[in-house]
Amino acid sequence: LVKLCLFDSNGFVANSFNPRLTQGLPDVKRGAILDINGKAIAQDEANSDGSYTRKYDETGNYAHVVGYTVKGKAGIESKYNFRLQTVSNELLQRIGHVFLGKEIQGNNVVLTIDDRLQQVAAEALGHEKGSIVAIEPSTGKILAMVSYPTFDSNTVSENWAELNSDDENSPLLNRATQGLYPPGSTFKIITAASALEVSQKYMDFNFKCTGDAKFGDSILHCYDGKAHGKVNMTSAFAKSCNGYFATVAEEIGNDQLIKTATDFGFNTDLNFPLEYKKASFALKSDSDVKELAATAIGQGKTLTSPLFMAMVTSAIANNGSMMQPYIVDHIETPGGSVKNRTLPTKLLQACDSSTAHQIADMMCEVV
């Protein structure tokens, strides 16, 4: 009981399924959710009877980020439920309500997302299943995050059964944070970093690509079986040569690749406010060469989310330093005061700055 009262009480109070948060404050106008420039993404609108209806951006661009407040809660609406329902200067607000007819309003939540970038990301994704995540490398600030298929937060209650039964499209799934996929050739960033952390000699490691290579009892092919000829690390990275990076992984060994993947944050909790699944790296010290080769090129059992791979590339752009990703910039009181501004925090050092610079240069060769 002591533990419950002293240590766990805040968690229970803030829980999105706590009915007291909505039933106890029927006259409170729930705070708005805003983009970084102050555009309302979700806000309460007053009804004639004094109640409020939650209204959302109708594009669907923010559905997975903002979430909803019916059938339970999801997204920012869930994680920041307590903040949105909390009344700052409650006594003064209630006096203003009684004598001046002013609304009693909860705090606003201001996102790091820029609506202009969010629109660009949504247009680029179109109707392709997947997601786009944009991060500011030096801070970890999420500038855009979209997922498709999406849904309309305004009509979740009416469409609840359909949204939950659509297994083919899974519209409620935030693919940016909850979708786990093989990273494919983007994992070659990890393999390259792993080799360079061992020795700079791998920058000049040469390999003759014939379009396929044998690892154990498995034949590994380059895309379309194309032979790249003689390549070093830079040209192999630019051409995405599977044989090269599988061979390099065989040279450095399982334990080194495991170490680098761990250094980059695979299998690590992110402490991110939206529901997420952590990146999974399953290679073991005694895994055979076939599995090692597949892992080195982003296949095998490795699974990661778009958010996490955006963090990986951001670490390369930030001198090897991976920042804690965040999507809420600050809390804003009804009077406009800023509270609880999120400060950039370093999550981990993924690799040396010199290694990051070399990989960044190689990434430019891909474009």
What are these model-predicted stretches?
Residues 138-185, 190-367:
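Beta-lactam-recognizing serine transpeptidase/beta-lactamase-like catalytic domain environment
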Residues 1-160, 171, 180, 205, ...:
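Periplasmic/cell-envelope proteins involved in peptidoglycan metabolism and beta-lactam response
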